[in-house]
């Protein structure tokens, strides 16, 4: 028996073991299948893929974080298997174009990774989102903010056009904002290289922003097409809508072809002229980008002429390539991806030409980019870490060869020998400086005042000194154009010797003031932690005997700011940048002192720079990095707490209402809600309404329009003392739930004007108007009723008499400007002409009798007649004190004579019925 039990238990155990093995194998297989796709998209080189930012036409965009440095990038993932060959060629063209352009307001391309299935583009990460969302959230912008954005857009566009690149798809969706609300032009998928003297043919872009010649399918100039798109964007910034909009695509295209649009009245006149010139149907009459820069609204208050980009044909120095073997294959591959260089053999022939041409210019631009930012393999440990669980890890596109392997000959015929870009107008700033070769590095200074707005303190002093020394002797490190060839060593040594001689002459000139210089240095060290650069300059100028050398101070500050990758434009020369070690190595304390001064200048940019910018005439330029503390408070976690203490709230308005009951306030509110077009309301409480105002199709459509949602509450005044017999005071509270603040304010102002226009206020205005009766002689043609001139005369006299002495008798004609009451008509006047019921369509041409002629003196304080009657309260009718006069809130002297008497007839009819 025991043996039988053992056999049964053994069979049960074996079956349980088999079931466990099957379950464990299934769980293992499910885990492997579920983890495979996650492991594939987990790493891209040293970057860990994180959340999805958005989805575009060609792929997905995710954030990536460097696993060592923590630097964030935006990774655009393109599925090569799902896209056609033509779309992939556009992606390759976008890569080549973005390698040509490096500008502070253009999104940067760092590196490219790929595997068999995907293509990964590592782009600059910006946290501000799209300009489109910013417009939808904020509504139309003020002129100052719109000008700042517009300047940055045309600055980037001018740089692209100088490189013969046309964007062709400019719209707010392709304009991104960084953390400082600066523009970054993105999405060069539609961009094209337009060779000088040629026209573009491809119709592309968005219909709302495309120019008429593109929609008609004609050949067009890409530069003029971009100007049209910029005009539409400027219209959207200032108006909050689009100039051409329609739900039907065919109708929209017809509107764009006609080019007829309406500019609202609130747009300034100078901006209206700019919009008309940019959104011009005829490309020949349309503004060029140079004309846009010269426009008074764009230049602002600065008197200096704007500095445009020079064409690259006048900037890039090209050389003779000895043979086909000397052509860099990587650069040749990138040029092949550009649409205008599809014929490879023709491209090679142009590159081997001894003359300066467009092909050679683009070649040396890309070659210089490769020299400055070589694509090298990633660290082995990082690659192994990312590829440990991935069968096909993304690999970085690297250079197949070094640039030093390919020799170059002499300068090409027609090439600029001394490029003006290096020595010329960009010496004062770093507008087009290189922005860091790796995404792990911070961009070197890139901001530049395109319109000549002056900086303060030592920066402007340094710029002035550089101009005094001569343009050929000093060049800004950041303004040294990175597309030109390296500086000749002999030229560099000559420039260094020139700078050293200038410094020695300056030191010898100031040698007699050594003691005062020491005192000035001590004073500057003490005030460095609490004063700005501008205050230091003013204190130095106020004490003539204490001299501080501005050259050493300003140069040191600039060197330290460029070392720390400051956002300000550095103005130190290339030689000063190379000799900064000698300046810092002469004495140890100088380095710490300079760092202290630098920290005092740059340590708290949010507040002390804001104070410095208050006195400037043009503080809204695209390069001003001033941070508005109000915006920072709104973005912070403690925004609601800080705004309640320091920032004035705009989403709640209270309107006090006096002399009205609760029911009358409700009735007036509901009447006002019903009278406003496109406004709907609902009752959510006994004294509470929910109001929603939706704008219909405007001039630009509803692309950027947003409705308003608000609560309207009627509450008793908390600070009133209720007295018996008096109407309590109420407060109507308007609370914004959603929508633009400016539109909410306008709606509240309209409703408050209706609520506060009480009966007593109207009566007071009528009394004041009655005391200001102007004498006038009414002819028969101007009287549109049965009343005669004598009635008008007596009416004016009796109105004055009533205010001077209420008990005094008046003329027998009438004491009421609107006509006598029925009870008055029964009283005889003693004249030949007795009053009867007036007729609205008959004019009374009866002559004035002798009894009424005594009232012809219109200036007398009172008047009496032989046939007078007692002005008792039982028989008199005073419309200015009666509730029946509520239908007219305007003073009496604002009515025309005919309208006044016709209104009196309506009052007669009501009195007769009573």
Swiss-Prot record:
Tissue occurrence: Expressed in neurons. Colocalizes with strd-1 along the dorsal nerve cord.
Chief location: other
The protein's name in its UniProt record: Serine/threonine kinase SAD-1
Chain intervals with Polar residues compositional bias: 473-482, 574-590, 823-837, 882-903
Reactions catalysed, as given in the entry: L-seryl-[protein] + ATP = O-phospho-L-seryl-[protein] + ADP + H(+); L-threonyl-[protein] + ATP = O-phospho-L-threonyl-[protein] + ADP + H(+)
Catalytic residues in the record: 169
Organism: Caenorhabditis elegans
Top-level lineage group: Eukaryota
Bias (Low complexity): 444-462, 527-551, 563-573, 780-796, 850-876
Family: Belongs to the protein kinase superfamily. CAMK Ser/Thr protein kinase family. SNF1 subfamily.
Cofactor(s) essential for the protein: Mg(2+)
Gene3D superfamilies, per the entry: Transferase(Phosphotransferase) domain 1
Region (Disordered): 375-551, 563-590, 757-914
E.C. code: 2.7.11.1
Keywords: ATP-binding, Kinase, Magnesium, Metal-binding, Neurogenesis, Nucleotide-binding, Serine/threonine-protein kinase, Synapse, Transferase
A UniProt-annotated Pfam family: KA1_BRSK
KO phenotype (gene knockout): Pre-synaptic vesicle and active zone proteins fail to be restricted to the axons of motor and sensory neurons. Synaptic vesicles fail to form tight clusters implying aberrant synaptic organization in addition to defects in neuronal polarity. Overexpression causes mislocalization of vesicle proteins to dendrites.
Gene (name only): sad-1
């Amino acid at each position: 028996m025991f043996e039988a039990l053992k056999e049964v238990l053994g069979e049960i155990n074996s079956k349980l073991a088999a079931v466990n093995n099957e379950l464990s194998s299934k769980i293992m297989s499910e885990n492997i299948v579920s983890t495979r796709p996650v492991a594939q998209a987990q790493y891209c080189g040293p970057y860990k893929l994180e959340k999805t930012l958005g989805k575009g036409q060609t792929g997905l965009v995710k954030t990536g974080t460097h696993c060592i440095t923590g630097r964030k990038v935006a990774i655009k993932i393109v599925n090569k298997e799902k896209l056609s060959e033509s779309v992939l060629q556009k992606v390759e063209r976008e890569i080549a174009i973005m390698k040509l352009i490096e500008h502070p307001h253009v999104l940067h391309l760092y590196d490219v990774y790929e595997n068999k299935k995907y293509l990964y583009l590592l782009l600059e990460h910006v946290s501000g989102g799209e300009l489109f969302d910013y417009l939808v959230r904020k509504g139309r912008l003020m002129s100052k903010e719109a000008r700042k954005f517009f300047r940055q857009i045309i600055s980037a566009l001018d740089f692209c056009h100088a490189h013969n690149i046309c964007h062709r798809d400019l719209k707010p969706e392709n304009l991104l904002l960084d953390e400082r609300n600066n523009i970054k032009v993105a999405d060069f998928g539609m961009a094209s290289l337009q060779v000088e003297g040629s026209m573009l043919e491809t119709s592309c872009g968005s219909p709302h922003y495309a120019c008429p010649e593109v929609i008609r399918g004609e050949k067009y100039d890409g530069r003029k097409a971009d100007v049209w798109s910029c005009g539409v964007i400027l219209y959207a910034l200032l108006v909050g809508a689009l100039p051409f909009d329609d739900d039907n695509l065919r109708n929209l295209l017809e509107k764009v072809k006609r080019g007829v649009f309406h500019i609202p009245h609130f747009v300034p006149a100078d901006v209206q002229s700019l919009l008309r010139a940019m959104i011009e149907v005829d490309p020949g009459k349309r503004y060029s980008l140079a004309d846009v820069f010269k426009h008074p609204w764009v230049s602002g208050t600065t008197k200096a002429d704007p500095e445009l980009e020079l064409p690259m044909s006048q900037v890039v120095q090209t050389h003779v390539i000895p043979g086909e073997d000397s052509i860099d294959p990587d650069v040749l591959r990138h040029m092949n991806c550009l649409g205008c260089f599809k014929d490879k053999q023709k491209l090679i022939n142009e590159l081997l030409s001894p003359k300066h041409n467009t092909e050679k210019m683009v070649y040396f631009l890309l070659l210089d980019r490769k020299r400055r930012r070589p694509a090298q393999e990633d660290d082995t440990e990082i690659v192994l870490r990312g590829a440990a669980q991935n069968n096909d890890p993304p690999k970085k596109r690297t250079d197949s060869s070094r640039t030093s392997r390919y020799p170059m000959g002499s300068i090409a015929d027609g090439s600029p020998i001394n490029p003006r870009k290096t020595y010329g107008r960009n010496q004062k700033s770093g507008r087009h400086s290189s922005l860091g070769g790796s995404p792990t590095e911070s961009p070197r200074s890139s901001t530049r005042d395109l319109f000549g707005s002056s900086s303060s303190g030592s920066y402007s002093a340094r710029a002035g000194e550089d101009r005094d020394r001569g343009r050929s002797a000093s060049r800004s490190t950041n303004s040294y154009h990175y597309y030109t060839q390296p500086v000749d060593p002999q030229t560099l040594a000559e420039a260094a010797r020139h700078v050293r001689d200038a410094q020695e002459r300056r030191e010898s000139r100031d040698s007699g003031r050594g003691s005062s210089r020491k005192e000035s240095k001590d004073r500057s060290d003490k005030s460095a932690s609490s004063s700005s650069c501008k205050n230091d300059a003013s204190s130095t100028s106020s004490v003539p005997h204490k001299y501080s050398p501005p050259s050493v101070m300003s140069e040191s500050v600039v060197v330290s700011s460029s070392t720390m990758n400051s956002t300000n434009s550095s103005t130190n020369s290339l030689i000063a940048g190379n000799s900064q070690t000698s300046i810092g190595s002469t004495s140890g304390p100088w380095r710490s002192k300079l760092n202290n001064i630098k920290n005092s200048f740059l340590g708290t940019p949010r507040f002390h720079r804001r104070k410095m910018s208050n006195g400037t005439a043009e503080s809204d330029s695209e390069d001003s990095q001033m941070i508005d503390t109000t915006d920072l408070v709104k973005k912070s976690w403690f925004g609601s707490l800080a705004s309640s203490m320091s920032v004035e709230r705009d989403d709640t308005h209270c309107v006090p209402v006096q002399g009205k009951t609760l029911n009358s306030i409700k009735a007036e509110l509901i009447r006002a809600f019903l009278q406003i077009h496109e406004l709907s309301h609902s009752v959510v409480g006994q004294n509470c309404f929910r109001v929603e105002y939706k704008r219909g199709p405007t001039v630009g459509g509803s692309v950027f329009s947003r409705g308003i949602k608000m609560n309207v509450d009627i509450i008793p005044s908390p600070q009133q003392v209720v007295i018996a017999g008096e109407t309590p005071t109420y407060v109507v509270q308007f609370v914004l739930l959603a929508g633009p603040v400016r539109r909410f304010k306008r709606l509240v102002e309209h409703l408050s004007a209706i609520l506060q226009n009480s009966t007593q206020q109207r009566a007071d205005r009528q009394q004041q108007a009655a005391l200001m009766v102007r004498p006038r002689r009414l002819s028969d043609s101007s009287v549109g009723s049965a009343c005669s001139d004598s009635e008008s005369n007596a009416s004016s006299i009796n109105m004055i008499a009533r205010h001077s002495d209420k008990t005094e008798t008046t003329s027998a004609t009438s004491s009421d400007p609107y006509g006598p009451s029925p009870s008055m008509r029964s009283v005889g006047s003693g004249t030949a002409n007795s009053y009867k019921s007036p007729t609205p369509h008959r004019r009374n041409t009866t002559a004035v009798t002798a009894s009424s002629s005594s009232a012809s003196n219109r200036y007398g304080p009172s008047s009496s007649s032989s046939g007078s009657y007692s002005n008792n309260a039982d028989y008199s009718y005073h419309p200015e004190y009666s509730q029946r006069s509520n239908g007219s809130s305007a003073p009496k002297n604002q009515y025309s004579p005919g309208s006044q008497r016709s209104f009196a007839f309506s009052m007669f009819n009501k009195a007769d019925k009573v």
